[in-house]
């Protein structure tokens, strides 16, 4: 793998996040959006806040900066506020990826927390992308349970659409 591969795969990550938001989250009623769930991190809102918080924390660690304080999902009562924060996180991630070089992939830039110090950049990048796929799948399941007709998020379909 090289830095271009990661930029490509993260374009998929961002595209699927946005597709999920625009196609399925925006049309929901407020009550559906915050409906409590016992599955995983809870409501659709809570899942999305978790997904964007994890993206932010890991990319801040890679950049050597402290992440913003994670706010409880209940503090994100407005979808426009969530979308604005998510857009800012995506832009921060894109900026990091734009500067990513092949040489950086095998470095260990994380200094805190202790348990993350031995992680290599490419491992963190794979983890974050995989985490996103996992939580989008969980979101799709919650949407399905609400009766929403969803679609797959297979990487190969992204490839076909971008050949």
Regions inferred by a protein language model and the residue ranges of each:
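Short, contiguous alpha-helical
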Residues: 7-26, 30-72, 113-163
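Helix-adjacent hinge/juxtasegments
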Residues: 64-102
């Amino acid at each position: 793998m090289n830095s271009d591969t990661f930029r490509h795969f993260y374009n998929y990550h961002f595209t699927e996040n946005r597709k999920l938001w625009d196609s399925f989250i925006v049309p929901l009623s407020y009550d559906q959006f915050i409906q409590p769930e016992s599955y995983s991190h809870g409501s659709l809102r809570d899942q999305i806040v978790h997904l964007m918080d994890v993206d932010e924390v890991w990319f801040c660690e890679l950049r050597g900066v402290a992440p913003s304080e994670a706010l409880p999902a209940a503090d994100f009562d407005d979808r426009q506020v969530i979308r604005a924060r998510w857009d800012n996180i995506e832009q921060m991630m894109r900026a990091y990826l734009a500067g990513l070089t092949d040489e950086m992939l095998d470095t260990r830039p994380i200094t805190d927390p202790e348990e993350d110090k031995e992680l290599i950049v490419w491992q963190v990048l794979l983890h974050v992308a995989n985490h996103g796929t996992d939580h989008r799948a969980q979101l799709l399941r919650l949407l399905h349970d609400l009766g929403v007709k969803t679609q797959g998020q297979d990487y190969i379909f992204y490839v076909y659409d971008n050949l």
